[in-house]
Curated annotation (Swiss-Prot):
Residues 52-121 are annotated as: Sigma-70 factor domain-2. It comes from Haemophilus influenzae (strain ATCC 51907 / DSM 11121 / KW20 / Rd). The gene is rpoH. Residues 250-269 bind DNA. A motif (Interaction with polymerase core subunit RpoC) lies at residues 76-79. This is RNA polymerase sigma factor RpoH.
Length: 281
């Protein structure tokens, strides 16, 4: 992978600058995309893979915005989505008859969703116990029931001890319908735009409401004690990445400690594992 692609897969500096740079890569026509996909699929052409990836970065950004309400760093959401995009490009079969973005959106969302599930508890220790219970139980409940009707909303609310409004809000957040992400055809009679071009977070106020909740004393004490058990550098990384209002990027901390961004990620991952094993909520 060349330096340009590596830099665009890991947002650095201001997120606004990254988005501007991503939007400068032109979108592909169906014919251009098919040609590049065939070169990659049949001949393992890495230059074709690069062009496919860079031309779809803007779609990752739009999908990542749909998860902004959880308070996680936008740069990290985008980076996780980019991992999903790379996996999709690698597996894309140009003979299937769909556009790459329709195939890739599922991989992009899967990577971001798993990232949210891995990290949301530590970030949102201030939320109510009922909200945490809902977040981590709703997915398995939905696997059993599918999309909820009114009676099922009542049942889930009673089962998890939360309000019906919370169930509906969380279901909307976690299970938004996947609509077509293809670009309009050239012969479209009216000027329309792909949902991927205007997809945005429809319920970002959800996290803002949660942030106004009072800390539960037990969870706060547990987290405080767990943080104190970490070494000074790990404490600083967790606070800077997850607890401060102005969250630092991996590259910010890499520069501070004169190590690579990957090393900071490793330290962060190890620290989060220790916190999760120490905090019971």
């Amino acid at each position: 992978m060349d330096k340009e692609t590596q830099m665009m897969l890991v947002p650095q500096g201001s997120i606004e600058g990254y988005i501007r740079a991503a939007n400068e890569y032109p979108m592909l026509t169906a014919e251009e995309e098919k040609e590049l996909a065939e070169r990659l699929y049949y001949h393992e052409d890495l230059d074709a893979a690069k062009k496919l990836i860079l031309s779809h970065l803007r779609f990752v950004i739009h999908v990542a915005r749909g998860y902004s309400g959880y308070g996680l760093p936008q740069a990290d959401l985008i980076q996780e989505g980019n991992i999903g995009l790379m996996k999709a490009v690698k597996r894309f079969n140009p003979e299937v008859g769909v556009r790459l973005v329709s195939f890739a959106v599922h991989w992009i969302k899967a990577e971001i969703h798993e990232y949210v599930l891995r990290n949301w508890r530590i970030v949102k220790v201030a939320t109510t116990k009922a909200q945490r219970k809902l977040f981590f139980n709703l997915r398995k409940t939905k696997q059993r029931l599918g999309w909820f009707n009114e009676n099922e909303v009542d049942m889930v609310a009673n089962e998890l001890g939360v309000s019906k409004e919370d169930v509906i809000e969380m279901e909307s957040r976690m299970s938004g319908a996947d609509v077509g992400f293809d670009l309009p055809t050239d012969d479209a009679e009216t000027e329309t735009y792909s949902p991927a071009l205007y997809l945005e977070d429809k319920s970002s106020n959800f996290a803002a409401e949660l942030e106004n909740e009072n800390f539960e004393s037990q969870a706060t004490e547990q987290l405080g004690a767990a943080l104190q058990s970490l070494d000074a550098r790990s404490q600083d990384i967790i606070k800077a990445r997850w607890l401060d209002d102005n969250k630092a990027t991996l590259h910010d901390l890499a520069a501070k400690y004169n190590v690579s961004a990957e090393r900071i990620r490793q330290l962060e991952t190890n620290a989060l594992k220790k916190l999760k094993s120490a905090v019971n909520f």
